[in-house]
Amino acid sequence: MSSGANITYASRKRRKPVQKTVKPIPAEGIKSNPSKRHRDRLNTELDRLASLLPFPQDVINKLDKLSVLRLSVSYLRAKSFFDVALKSTPADRNGGQDQCRAQIRDWQDLQEGEFLLQALNGFVLVVTADALVFYASSTIQDYLGFQQSDVIHQSVYELIHTEDRAEFQRQLHWALNPDSAQGVDEAHGPPQAAVYYTPDQLPPENASFMERCFRCRLRCLLDNSSGFLAMNFQGRLKYLHGQNKKGKDGALLPPQLALFAIATPLQPPSILEIRTKNFIFRTKHKLDFTPIGCDAKGQLILGYTEVELCTRGSGYQFIHAADMLHCAESHIRMIKTGESGMTVFRLLAKHSRWRWVQSNARLIYRNGRPDYIIVTQRPLTDEEGREHLQKRSTSLPFMFATGEAVLYEISSPFSPIMDPLPIRTKSNTSRKDWAPQSTPSKDSFHPSSLMSALIQQDESIYLCPPSSPAPLDSHFLMGSVSKCGSWQDSFAAAGSEAALKHEQIGHAQDVNLALSGGPSELFPDNKNNDLYNIMRNLGIDFEDIRSMQNEEFFRTDSTAAGEVDFKDIDITDEILTYMQDSLNNSTLMNSACQQQPVTQHLSCMLQERLQLEQQQQLQQPPPQALEPQQQLCQMVCPQQDLGPKHTQINGTFASWNPTPPVSFNCPQQELKHYQLFSSLQGTAQEFPYKPEVDSVPYTQNFAPCNQPLLPEHSKSVQLDFPGRDFEPSLHPTTSNLDFVSCLQVPENQSHGINSQSAMVSPQAYYAGAMSMYQCQPGPQRTPVDQTQYSSEIPGSQAFLSKVQSRGIFNETYSSDLSSIGHAAQTTGHLHHLAEARPLPDITPGGFL
């Protein structure tokens, strides 16, 4: 601290000067010099007194004579205060056993106090009424950068910003009203307290208005922007006992008030700062960055002793080669401006370990000239260091790791060492890379140059065990991709699954071909490779690695171990269950073709047209002549579930070719939209639960009322129904069509057949195997196809009785419909087989 007129803020204390070398004793004897003997005795006593101070040895070695005296007085005053404040009982002082127990308890309290200081987000400060720092905890260094020995028994105003000194003086007064005559002299430091109060004039110590909470800015050596740190002071005024001060008349003064407070930063620290605040260390360097000192924390983090650190020469020997030019740039900036700014680089610790540090260097002046450099460094994690390395600016036309060729106009012979990556393998730095003829000698460079520091570094500090080879990693990545793709295989058909499997096998063969170059390609220079030696000791060959990379090997091994392969998981039932719970529609699919999606737009158009035609039908009711026809249809189809939706066919019916064509005189009936695909809404009917297969759009062409009943198709067999009774045929007829398979339903279900009379524009629906849905009754609807009922037709009665009895149509029928108005030219037989078979040769169009 300085009290000069031009210096108003605190600075670092001057240190003990370096002792001169002891001159040899002359042969003629020692001359008597009383003044020198007096100085020697004084220095001896000061050294003995300094050794008694409660400070680390590295701090004591740097104290000058005045600092030793100042700290000794401060320690004695603090001891006197605690002797009074923590006065023990006479029994404890007289009893030896109790005294031993008290010493153990005091030692435990001391250890607990150190832990409390480390956990506290701030430091403890005690300031007397005359603005002297009575005590400051050692943690003040973590926040302000000052040593504890630098601020004790010094004026507190030298630490406070000039604009906040008046407020701090007001807070020191018990009534917040200090004497105006005792102003703060900004040039010459703090005032001397001339007014002392007696206990009668002061309020009780436990009064509420003795509490203090205020803010002010303190001088901070760690701040890079303003040099001050805003802190919050929270505490109270308490009596400072045991000081034994005397007045001008020699009378003993009563204890005076002092501020006991905890100073905490206004901005709370981050988690990273909390973790690393106890590891900040400082080093001292010459102007050429040669280290000349290190504190105790630095020795603990780096592992060097102060002697090992100071006898190595240039400080650039401890810096990573890829960071040398980056640090040199900050070094030049510090020489020009006095401060380097925050610099992140890798520092070499003991046992060839690299530590990322964030440092800030300051230039210290003495007598107006630069004297030495103080560097404050904070350790970083490897992740933080890599982030700073990526953000590092590369404004120069070369990287910091390979810039020597530009600076020295020579080709760099140190390409393996100058790799900017911190991790290198031994295989990449063989002896053949270090040509003896290209390696310059140490004497060819200046001792203080970067190249000289680089040559003095050991090559082993840049070496580490090799990592796993890249081909194995790429194969594992491909294996994970194939496993993810196996989920899609469960939805594909058998043919596409085989093709995908063949493609995956092809990929595995490509990987094996890529790795078939031999061990030399996988592991270059494998004789010097640690991984190769370990594999040889374990009895593992490169052929074993190739077999492990084979996909079939992994699959066989996992199957033998009882593991479940993703491709063996069948989720079809789960998907069907989800669709059954979510939708009320059915899905009819054809087993011979692939599924074709139906868009939602088609569903909307069909629903709108259905609503329009329903309104037209309500406006035009059917005539009375159709009532028997409707009754017959209702009797034939007792449940709507057994309507045309249940009589779909795997294939097509044969074309009916009646002669002459008959036209039914009936009005156009309501157009029914049979939305048989699951994505179409509008039907509430469900069907018997059948296995799902692929489906195909099935188109049914309907004829108008004034046209023949069915169009002609040359590829189909004509089936004509005579107008007589339905009688079983004794002899099956031959046909080009093998069979016409109807939808198979359980035996307890009945079949409803509706003869279609009035047919309208063609409609598209899906024919095939039924969806696996449970049959539920739906809303009653008027059938599309209605046949006029006539009591004169005995065959109709027999057919109706069979339908109502819910029998199974497994036999062959021949029908005679001459009463309807046409004669049969060819008798057709309708076979209802037990199983449905696909008809690939028949066109997807037919009539029922």
From Swiss-Prot:
GO molecular function terms attached to this record: E-box binding; nuclear receptor activity; protein heterodimerization activity; protein homodimerization activity; sequence-specific double-stranded DNA binding
Prodomain residues: 1-9
Span of domain PAC: 342-383
Domain PAS: 111-175, 266-336
Cell compartment(s), UniProt: Cytoplasm; Nucleus
Keyword 4Fe-4S found: no
Taxonomy, superkingdom: Eukaryota
Segments carrying motif Nuclear export signal: 63-71
Database matches in InterPro entries: AHR/AHRR (IPR039091), AHR_bHLH (IPR033348), bHLH_dom (IPR011598), HLH_DNA-bd_sf (IPR036638), PAC (IPR001610), PAS (IPR000014), PAS-like_dom_sf (IPR035965), PAS_fold (IPR013767)
Record motif Nuclear localization signal 1, residues: 12-15
Cysteine-cysteine disulfides: none
One GO cellular component, as annotated: nuclear aryl hydrocarbon receptor complex
Pfam family, any one: HLH
GO biological process: cellular response to 2,3,7,8-tetrachlorodibenzodioxine; cellular response to 3-methylcholanthrene; circadian regulation of gene expression; negative regulation of DNA-templated transcription; negative regulation of T cell mediated immune response to tumor cell; positive regulation of transcription by RNA polymerase II; regulation of adaptive immune response; regulation of DNA-templated transcription
Subcellular location, principal: cytoplasm
Function: Ligand-activated transcription factor that enables cells to adapt to changing conditions by sensing compounds from the environment, diet, microbiome and cellular metabolism, and which plays important roles in development, immunity and cancer. Upon ligand binding, translocates into the nucleus, where it heterodimerizes with ARNT and induces transcription by binding to xenobiotic response elements (XRE). Regulates a variety of biological processes, including angiogenesis, hematopoiesis, drug and lipid metabolism, cell motility and immune modulation.
Assembly behavior: Homodimer. Heterodimer; efficient DNA binding requires dimerization with another bHLH protein. Interacts with ARNT; the heterodimer ARNT:AHR binds to core DNA sequence 5'-TGCGTG-3' within the dioxin response element (DRE) of target gene promoters and activates their transcription. Binds MYBBP1A. Interacts with coactivators including SRC-1, RIP140 and NOCA7, and with the corepressor SMRT. Interacts with NEDD8 and IVNS1ABP. Interacts with BMAL1. Interacts with HSP90AB1. Interacts with TIPARP; leading to mono-ADP-ribosylation of AHR and subsequent inhibition of AHR.
Written domain comment of the UniProt record: The PAS 1 domain is essential for dimerization and also required for AHR:ARNT heterodimerization.
Record protein name field: Aryl hydrocarbon receptor
Gene name of the encoded protein: Ahr
